Regions:
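C-terminal "cap" of GNAT-fold acetyltransferases
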Residues: 77, 84-87, 97-100, 107-130
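Active-site rim helix/loop that mediates acceptor-substrate recognition in acyltransferases
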Residues: 1-18
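Conserved beta-strand in the GNAT
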Residues: 20, 26-35, 43
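Short alpha-helical
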Residues: 39, 88-89
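A short acidic/small-residue loop/turn micro-motif
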Residues: 35-37, 109
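Conserved acetyl-CoA-binding loop-helix of GNAT-fold acetyltransferases
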Residues: 49, 56-69, 92-96
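Conserved acetyl-CoA binding element of GNAT-fold acetyltransferases
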Residues: 40-52
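Short amphipathic alpha-helix that is part of the acyltransferase structural core
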Residues: 1-4, 22, 120, 129-130
């Protein structure tokens, strides 16, 4: 994993962190996150392995583990992320990595809501403090 620096991220987030997964010199995926100070939760705002042929080979897990290290170091009480209800592979991936469903938004993506079979799912993982 390598740290990614991008002025664009800095413009819209306070202290964003991003990491890239590389195969040789090619970026194959990335993850970004930041601490939501107002509620002390660490928001994983994006995680992606670009090529579907490279998924389920460990890059996504490595990216998630890396950003979770930062989430833990941040002192946040919980790590949170969102996915879409039709993305069963992502939901399974997050559950396998200790996340649970903590909320829904029927109208996040469309005013037609559930009729379009696309509900926003909020998932979270408690970060334990000693």
């Amino acid at each position: 994993m390598e740290s990614l620096e991008d002025d664009m991220l800095s413009d819209w987030l306070d202290n964003p962190i991003a990491y890239g997964a590389f195969e040789e010199d090619k970026l194959i995926g990335f993850v970004e996150g930041f601490l939501e100070e107002w509620n002390n939760r660490y928001r994983i705002s994006n995680i992606c392995v670009f090529d579907s042929g490279l998924r389920s080979k460990g890059a996504g897990t490595a990216l998630l583990e890396k950003i979770m290290e930062d989430a833990d170091k941040s002192g946040a009480r919980m790590a949170v992320l969102e996915t879409q209800s039709y993305n069963s592979k992502a939901i399974s991936f997050y559950k396998k990595n200790g996340f649970e469903i903590i909320g829904f938004d029927r109208y996040a993506y469309s005013n037609n809501g559930p009729e379009e079979h696309n509900i926003r799912i909020e998932m979270g993982k408690k970060l334990f403090r000693g």
